[in-house]
């Protein structure tokens, strides 16, 4: 419903403009309070969840994927580069689920792109980049990066192959919302790509059907005619 996204996101953006520089870093790395343009955040009460402790203990053994690092073509000129990981490829960004104004900018860029309004799509894509990259070169239809054929996401939310513009929007979303609980949902709504990870010498494959959870056996037994989700029969 791309048309309805636009007025709502634009209204929120007027009230909660983008941060940049030190203000942005402070907002991202704050563990205790809800900063300025954050609408909703996880871990409102300190100590309410041990997920951060679990993640911290796993960081040395799970380096940041090189394909993600390669998205930062401007390197240190992008403030998110040093904020997200260190030279050992260890994650350094504070783990927090958030809904904040930067996501509204990304939603606007994507919505306008889906409506074939490339001028406004570029406007909002460049708005975000101008607040994160110094010095910054605006994207145009002519200088957009080529679509990476090896990227995990290869189709958009409508199932169409990614254009250069949509791929650039997806890349900015991945960089901006890293460690904020967004990536799984992006994979789910953009083609449900299959991938694998290794742990303890074993290969674990995420198949398309796994983006939907199975229905509990008790519910299947209690509700006559209820069908198990595909892949879990």
Predicted regions mapped to residue ranges:
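Active-site-adjacent substrate-recognition loops and nearby beta-strands
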Residues: 50-64
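Acidic/polar-rich alpha-helix caps and helix-coil junctions
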Residues: 1-49, 66-233
């Amino acid at each position: 419903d791309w048309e309805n996204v636009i007025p709502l996101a634009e209204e929120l953006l007027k009230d909660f403009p983008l941060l940049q520089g030190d203000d942005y870093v402070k907002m991202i790395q704050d563990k205790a309070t809800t900063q300025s343009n954050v609408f909703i955040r996880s871990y409102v009460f300190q100590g309410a969840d041990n997920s951060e402790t679990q993640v911290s203990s796993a960081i040395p053994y799970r380096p940041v994927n090189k394909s993600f690092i390669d998205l930062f073509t401007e390197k240190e000129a992008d403030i998110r580069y040093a904020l997200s990981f260190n030279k050992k490829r260890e994650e350094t960004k504070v783990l927090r689920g958030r809904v904040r104004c930067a996501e509204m900018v990304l939603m606007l860029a994507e919505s306008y792109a889906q409506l074939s309004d490339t001028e406004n799509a570029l406007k909002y894509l460049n708005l975000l980049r101008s607040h994160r990259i110094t010095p910054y070169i605006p994207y145009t239809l002519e200088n957009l990066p080529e679509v990476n054929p090896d990227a995990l996401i290869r189709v958009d939310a409508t199932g169409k192959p990614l254009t250069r513009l949509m791929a650039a929007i997806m890349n900015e979303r991945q960089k901006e919302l890293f460690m904020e609980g967004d990536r799984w949902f992006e994979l789910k709504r953009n083609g449900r790509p299959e991938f694998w990870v290794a742990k303890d010498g074993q290969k674990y494959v995420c198949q398309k059907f796994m983006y939907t959870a199975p229905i509990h056996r008790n519910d299947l037994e209690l509700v006559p005619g209820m069908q198990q989700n595909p892949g879990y029969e």
